[in-house]
């Protein structure tokens, strides 16, 4: 699954005074190697050593400005560093599962600037009179600044005149799941709400949906101009849970929530054709938040409890690699 939504804030929000700047750095790590078709895990892939392994790091630099205590503007500049390991099969030699025997592996990679985001958000209720509950709505733009067609060398099965395996090097676009950019403009819809239910205990809910009206970015999955064109799909992240400030003087809060993240089969705006891997993961997300004297930090580890590689727009099934867990870290400073 593609990972392009970086680390969100956790727990209850704190209002910023007019003129306040907040800078932050966040990191997301995702190691995907568990294959699913629908919600059925394809354990044969690991057993025969053919699983695809995506290792993705996303570092996000952001700055936000409080236009007023009610209105905020945020600029987010992400950088992605990713590798993808995959197998080479010899179809002349079937293994115990009836597939070609895995005889080699190779790795492709891509890194660089990802897609920049600009977001404006507003608290619906007056912060002065609603210190213990509020709802924020946000609207933004995703800019196609990340490279959509990074290329690397693939190892393709081939033999010499004696029939001995002699891999052929083939330069092509790396897989869509590790491309730094989506290759299209996007519209960002953002929602966040919190409410204090007891002293030092709050509940929260958040959602981000990135709509990409463009059907595809003209990037194919084969050598040269061959193969299928990758679709530009929407993406989403929904979270809900509670936070308990167990050490108020130290500014420490424990959070626990549910998380659903993925990419749909059908976009809400525009066409949905082309090749894509729709699906989602549902996770339990424990976390820890620190906020004191203008500093803030958060760490969470969503652990997957359900994964589903859905059928695409045309009704075709396929597999996708999911992670068992991801790690999210952020550090911020307001001044």
Please state what every model-predicted region is.
Residues 82-231:
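Outer-membrane pore/translocation modules
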Residues 2, 29-58, 177:
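Surface-exposed strand-loop-strand hairpins of Gram-negative outer-membrane beta-barrel proteins
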Residues 36-45, 210, 214-335:
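Outer membrane beta-barrel transmembrane domains
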Residues 11-20, 32-35, 70, 126-135, ...:
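Short loop/turn motifs that connect adjacent beta-strands in outer-membrane beta-barrel proteins
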Residues 25-29, 75-79, 137-143, 205-209, ...:
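Transmembrane beta-barrel strands of outer-membrane/channel proteins
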Residues 19, 55-59, 102, 110-116, ...:
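Residues that define the transmembrane beta-barrel architecture of outer-membrane proteins
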Residues 61, 118-120, 137, 189-191, ...:
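Membrane-embedded beta-strands of outer-membrane beta-barrel proteins
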Residues 16, 27-29, 65, 77, ...:
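Residue-level signature of outer-membrane beta-barrel architecture
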């Amino acid at each position: 699954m593609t990972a392009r939504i970086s680390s969100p804030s956790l727990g209850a929000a704190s209002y910023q005074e007019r003129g306040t700047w907040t800078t932050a750095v966040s990191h997301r790590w995702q190691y995907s190697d568990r294959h699913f078709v629908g919600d059925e895990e394809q354990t044969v892939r690991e057993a025969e050593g053919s699983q695809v392994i995506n290792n993705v790091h996303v570092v996000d630099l952001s700055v936000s400005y409080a236009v007023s205590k009610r209105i905020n503007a945020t600029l987010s500049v992400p950088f992605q560093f990713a590798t993808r390991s995959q197998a080479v099969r010899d179809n002349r030699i079937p293994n115990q599962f009836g597939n070609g025997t895995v005889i080699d592996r190779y790795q492709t990679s891509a890194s660089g600037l990802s897609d920049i985001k600009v977001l404006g958000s507003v608290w619906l209720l007056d912060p002065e009179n609603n210190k213990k509950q509020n709802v924020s709505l946000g609207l933004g733009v995703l800019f196609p600044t990340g490279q959509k067609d990074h290329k690397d060398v693939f190892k393709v099965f081939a033999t010499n005149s004696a029939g001995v395996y002699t891999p052929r090097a083939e330069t092509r676009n790396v897989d869509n799941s590790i491309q730094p950019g989506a290759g299209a403009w996007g519209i960002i819809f953002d929602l966040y709400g919190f409410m204090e239910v007891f002293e030092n205990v709050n509940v929260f809910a958040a959602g981000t949906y990135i709509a990409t009206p463009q059907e595809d970015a003209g990037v194919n999955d084969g050598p040269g101009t061959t193969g299928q064109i990758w679709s530009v799909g929407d993406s989403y992240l929904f979270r809900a849970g509670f936070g308990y400030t167990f050490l108020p003087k130290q500014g420490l809060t424990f959070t626990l929530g549910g998380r659903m993240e993925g990419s749909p089969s059908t976009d809400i705006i525009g066409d949905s054709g082309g090749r894509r891997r729709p699906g989602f993961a549902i996770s339990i997300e424990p976390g820890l938040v620190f906020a004191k004297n203008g500093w803030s930090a958060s760490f969470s580890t969503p652990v997957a409890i359900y994964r589903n590689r859905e059928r695409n727009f045309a009704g075709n099934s396929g597999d996708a690699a999911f992670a068992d867990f991801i790690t999210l870290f952020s550090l911020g400073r307001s001044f």
